[in-house]
Amino acid sequence: MEREQDTPWTRSTEHTNIQKRENGQPTQKLGRPNLIQLMDHYLRIMNQVDMHKQTAFWKQWLSLKNPTQESLKTRVLKRWRLFNRQGWTS
């Protein structure tokens, strides 16, 4: 009988099914995650990503020394363009 690979995906699912082998000994096999588990996993990962982005963003701002209004405006526009991936029209 084939064993499932031990991956972060299979480790992240807590649901287990118990199957009987042909010789009668029970084995545990990770089941497929249901929709609620998938959404929970997705939201946890995205929350971690957002926290990392916010931390990196504020570290950049705090590292600026005596910023002028123009330099801040330029910086904000660059960030805006990167996040939206659209051409800037002035």
Swiss-Prot record:
Residues 65-87 are annotated as: Mitochondrial targeting sequence. GO terms for biological process: symbiont-mediated perturbation of host apoptosis; symbiont-mediated suppression of host cytoplasmic pattern recognition receptor signaling pathway via inhibition of MAVS activity. Residues 1-23 have a biased composition (Basic and acidic residues). GO terms for cellular component: host cell cytosol; host cell mitochondrial inner membrane; host cell nucleus; membrane. InterPro entries: Flu_proapoptotic_PB1-F2 (IPR021045). Pfam families: PB1-F2. The record marks 66 as: Low pathogenicity. The keyword Membrane applies. The keyword Magnesium does not apply. Signal peptide: none annotated. Residues 1-33 are annotated as: Disordered. Keywords: Apoptosis, Host cytoplasm, Host membrane, Host mitochondrion, Host mitochondrion inner membrane, Host nucleus, Host-virus interaction, Inhibition of host innate immune response by virus, Inhibition of host MAVS by virus, Inhibition of host RLR pathway by virus, Membrane, Modulation of host cell apoptosis by virus, Viral immunoevasion. It is found in: Host mitochondrion inner membrane; Host nucleus; Host cytoplasm, Host cytosol. Belongs to the influenza viruses PB1-F2 family. Plays an important role in promoting lung pathology in both primary viral infection and secondary bacterial infection. Promotes alteration of mitochondrial morphology, dissipation of mitochondrial membrane potential, and cell death. Alternatively, inhibits the production of interferon in the infected cell at the level of host mitochondrial antiviral signaling MAVS. Its level of expression differs greatly depending on which cell type is infected, in a manner that is independent of the levels of expression of other viral proteins. Monocytic cells are more affected than epithelial cells. Oligomer. Interacts with human SLC25A6/ANT3 and VDAC1. Interacts with host MAVS. Is not encoded in all strains, and seems to be dispensable for replication. This is Protein PB1-F2. It comes from Influenza A virus (strain A/Turkey/Minnesota/501/1978 H6N8).
